[in-house]
Amino acid sequence: MDKNEIILKLKNTSTSPGVYLWKDAKQNVLYVGKAKNLRKRLLQYFDGAINSYKTSKLMSLVADFEVYICKTNKEALLLEKAMVDRFNPEFNILLLDDRKYPYLKVQLLKDSLLITLSRKVNTKYTKNTLYYGPFPSGYGAKPILKLLQHEALYESGLLIKNNDSSFWVNQFAKIKEILSFKNNNYLNELTNKMHTAANNMQFELALFLRDGLTYLKKLKESQIIELSQYKNIDVFAYKTDEKLIYATVLFYRYGVLINKVNLTIPLGISIDESIRVFFEQFYADKILPDNFIVQEEILKYDLNLSSDYKFISPKIGTNKKVLDLALLNLNDYYEKEHLIMQNQLEKADSMLSSLNKYLNLPKLKNIVIFDNSNINNINPVGVAIVYTNGIKNKSLYRKFNLEALSYRSADVDYIRQSITKFFSSDKNTKDFDLIITDGGLQQVNEAKKTLKVLGINIPVIGLVKNEYHKTRALIDLNLNEIYVNDLELHNYLAQIQIEVDRFAKSHFRNRQKISSLEGKLRNIKGLGHNMEQKLLNHFKSYAKIYDASVEELAKIVPFNVAKSIKNKDYE
């Protein structure tokens, strides 16, 4: 269909909410979008209301469209996500921020209180669960975790047991009160406890309380009293250039600034669509705040978000001050990053174009690379890493434990196992533009054979290393070994091999460590199979068991066993 025929067809399209697909002349899906009013949204593409550097390119390829009517916004959101996963459209964006930020999770149970750190948030949590966060990755959450565990779960250094439910209700309320920072009562109480411990020569306890007190005071100092009535407020500020959106998010909890996140968002077919995708993807695993404080232009966009997203654009007062603070941080981030990001995008685009001269594929948006690692076929592992638009997409990295094999060609079979595990998982999209195996002709042929068994049709190439473990050549789509003379492309492919090798070896070392930890744990006196399973069910891995404090371990196993684990008292 030409432009006039499409517009004519659009005029008969439903005005209901739903999902739309722009298609090219071969019926390939170019873009999947969501709209409150399908007809109005689709017509906007032709009247100039939707405009970015990608819009004109998209519309030059459009030859048809398809719509799906939905009853609710949530239904449309789920369908849109499913369609994007299914078709991997060229013009849809994916947030490349793979960071998972920890939350303090306080859960009131029938006869106890559970205080942990969690990177997974149940957004449908009940009144008996409190999430406090997100904290910065790598630090910040552990001091307050240990302090609150000490405060709520221990008395005179001993784990509290066998108290009635009303006691734990009071402890839960106390934790909520502490985290609200309503006054200095708890800080004063903590100061007195610290001095008492020091006077009684309990220096280890005094130091522990001092560290907790210092941390809480820093949080308290950042508190904006006028915001303390709100449990959660997030401040979102952004600015754009031709290809990217730069954003800063400030997280306020009861008026306390607990985290700041700077990130870069790929600019899709329009700014409003890109910002909508950001909010839906970024907050998919986070607690939505009571309010978002944003710039005025955000309110003008048709973001088509659920009613749970509440936006405020202040002109005066405290809210304006925190928005100005976010903008100040944003400008600093932009000045440092925008040239770097532009160069990175331009280089990635150039490298994909250079690579495609050898392949002649329709597009190279998503590439998945497979590798494995083992020593003498002991504890073999496999990994998959993904590059989106030529840039590492760590949110789609995957790792697998493989079945150990003893024969000489096991290395080739490990590619089969990795590809099978990757594409058999419902969590992974199957719509990739290219597969790269770390290895030569044998690995490429094994990958092709495996894909045929799985009923998946994706082109496969290989990257061959020399005797010094450096990138030597490319196995192309016709199974020819090609030496890449383009030095920049050669270095780019070498970096991909280095990255997949790094990820594979990192996972292998972790598996070796866990295997070793597993054996040591079973040598601890008084720790049997059932107790081991309880620990694993709670901590999820052997490494986390060994990283846990005595107090955390004692919630699951007897105190003497917890102490033996921490002291590494192996028989």
Swiss-Prot record:
UVR domain: residues covered: 184-219
Biological process (GO), any one: SOS response
Principal cellular location given in the protein's record: cytoplasm
Alphabetical UniProt keywords: Cytoplasm, DNA damage, DNA excision, DNA repair, Excision nuclease, SOS response
Ranges for domain GIY-YIG: 15-93
Cellular-component GO terms for this entry: cytoplasm; excinuclease repair complex
Pfam family name, one: UvrC_RNaseH_dom
SUPFAM superfamilies (UniProt xref): C-terminal UvrC-binding domain of UvrB, GIY-YIG endonuclease, RuvA domain 2-like
PROSITE patterns, per the entry: GIY_YIG, UVR, UVRC
InterPro entries for the chain: GIY-YIG_endonuc, GIY-YIG_endonuc_sf, GIY-YIG_UvrC_Cho, RuvA_2-like, UVR_dom, UVR_dom_sf, UvrABC_protein_C, UvrC
MF terms (GO), sorted A to Z: DNA binding; excinuclease ABC activity
Superkingdom per UniProt: Bacteria
Subunit structure: Interacts with UvrB in an incision complex.
Role description: The UvrABC repair system catalyzes the recognition and processing of DNA lesions. UvrC both incises the 5' and 3' sides of the lesion. The N-terminal half is responsible for the 3' incision and the C-terminal half is responsible for the 5' incision.
Family designation: Belongs to the UvrC family.
Name of this protein: UvrABC system protein C
Record organism: Mycoplasmopsis agalactiae (strain NCTC 10123 / CIP 59.7 / PG2) (Mycoplasma agalactiae)
Chain's gene name: uvrC
